[in-house]
Amino acid sequence: MSEQANKEMVRRYVRYLKLQRNMSGNTLDAYQRDLRKLLDYLEGEGKDPCEVQLEDLEQFSAGLHDIGIHARSQCRILSGVRSFFRFLQLDGYRDDDPTELLESPQIGQHLPEVLTTAEVDRLEASIDLSKWEGHRNRAIIEVLFSCGLRVSELTNLKLSNLYLDEQFIRVMGKGSKERLVPISKKAIQELGFWFDDRQHMDIKPGEEDYVFLNRRGAHLTRVMILIMIKRQAEAAGIQKTISPHTLRHSFATALLEGGADLRVIQALLGHESIGTTEIYTHIDTSTLRREILEHHPRNMKR
């Protein structure tokens, strides 16, 4: 189906929602945002909505789970997907409905907590900048939230991995697989404050290239970062049970809810989930940067 035909199909669906389903403006907007997530995913996979099979939709659903989207949000998105394919069948675009056997996640299934941007701001504001580690801790939280790193990726981040003039960092992920991740101007600013303090430290031999150091001049461990974040959450009055991984999931959720392409989010997280193996063969760095600039709250114009 041509791009123009696809646009006409979506236009007819939106009209159907307005007239037949009598949807309000806000609900209609939400349905269209969720539909765009699916259509962007299918376009990246080279799939036509009129030819999609159950397996394709299961891969899309698995991708939502992989990036840590809460079960309730997954159910909402999949509800919109079902509505779309029911319309395609009703309107004669398809003879079948591939969503008939598509399962939704259990609402009660456990997924990590997610912080809002305001809660991340509270977390950072609770840090005492008069202490030697203040700017370091703020930079850690901001890099985790702005770049979506695993805690192990953060502890192993090197100065030689930073390309701050280009606003990218090189991350060594699972299985020693490298990826480039855009970094926000705010994260770069926080790193700059930390580097001003870092240059006055006595650094142990062999540790000079690590970005984040403890007071003894050695690189941080995962446990050190976990303890720091839990203490700051308590200081900020955040009642949620959080960890460094919470900030990674918050990064992914903020991007998805902001309208970013699911495949791009998976690439930024360093995932090789179902249907997304070798995703970097399809997504270049300019696309990654554009998605971050357009859809992450640290970059969106307010």
Task: Identify the meaning behind each predicted range.
Residues M1-R302:
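Conserved catalytic core of the tyrosine transesterase superfamily
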